[in-house]
């Protein structure tokens, strides 16, 4: 991994120069500050100031890995476009005694193992992130489902309210019908009472008529008996008249026979002429007249009585027939009214049962709707709480993912720097490894907190930027960084 910018400040004079310098290094003490991921190390032992890309060869500065922050390279530099006179510092051509640490390979192996373990942890974190993303999608789907479900069932309350209002209107109509039917029932009961009174009156009239009929029947029977007696008397009188007639005729015949046997002629000298025939004829005529008048009177009286009784029987029969018809009509009306009353009672009971059932169903539906609404509100509240927890977990996972992305980017830069270092090759240098703070120190080791005596290299987390300056480095001392041409405003740590 290469640094974003390189700045070199020499302590020989206050002036500064850029990172690509055309002049050779001057003997002075330099503090080269590198910026690995973390850890601080100081390097001391280099004399002479030089840039990262110097015309007159020098050391090439860079940073890599979590465990080391400085690497020395070979002498390199671009060839000038033209041959010019170059002044070379002879002190730079002397070989350096860097004293390479023999434990560098072990440290590299440990670093590789650490990278493998970190990669395994990273893969586990990736799997966890994927699992949490799936859980997040599942919970988002559940939340959307519950929200849609709430939206779909939010219309239940007005629906139940309308249904309850309809049931109330029906109950009011049923109550109005019940009142109307009650008034009709009262009217029918009053009419029924009137008909009952009329029926009782007609029954009383019928009883009176039957009593009169019985009395008249007795009178008719008496008249018939009297007629029979009179007819018997008439027959007896007729027989008696016939007997007397025959008797008188026989006496007359006997007398005439006696008279014919005797021829005595008696002459009376009187003015009376006894005529028995006239007397008998007169008596007979009188009796005949009496019998005729008696018969005529009896027949006329019998006929009148019969006609009267017939007229009375016909009149009473007609009255009885009308009374029977009225009684039958009243019975039919009573039966019809009784059936209507029973039907009205049945309808009233059915309507009352329907009203009670409707009220019970409405109350049950309302309580069920309230229970469902409470359950939905509880489910929505629980879904909101679960969503809040999932959002927090998702935020934590995203924070972890962000940290892992940062670590991945750091590992990628470390691996790129390691590959570049392996490609360039390793020179014979003395490397002192300090794995406690993640820095590799070449030369004298400056532990964080101590102050270097000579020029040093400090490795601190500064996003991969290399700062070379004359002065002290944090946390060893106060940093004093000067940048050439005003290209840098502050030192990176």
Curated annotation (Swiss-Prot):
It comes from the Eukaryota. Residues 112-146 are annotated as: Coil 1A. Residues 147-156 are annotated as: Linker 1. Residues 157-257 are annotated as: Coil 1B. GO terms for molecular function: structural constituent of skin epidermis. GO terms for biological process: epidermis development; hair cycle; intermediate filament organization; keratinization. Residues 275-418 are annotated as: Coil 2. Synthesis begins in the cortex 10-15 cell layers above the apex of the dermal papilla and ends abruptly in the middle of the cortex. Keywords: Coiled coil, Disease variant, Intermediate filament, Isopeptide bond, Keratin, Palmoplantar keratoderma, Ubl conjugation. Residues 419-493 are annotated as: Tail. GO terms for cellular component: cytosol; extracellular space; keratin filament. Residues 1-111 are annotated as: Head. InterPro entries: Growth_fac_rcpt_cys_sf, IF_conserved, IF_rod_dom, Keratin_2_head, Keratin_II. Residues 258-274 are annotated as: Linker 12. PROSITE patterns: IF_ROD_1, IF_ROD_2. Heterotetramer of two type I and two type II keratins. Belongs to the intermediate filament family. There are two types of hair/microfibrillar keratin, I (acidic) and II (neutral to basic). This is Keratin, type II cuticular Hb3.
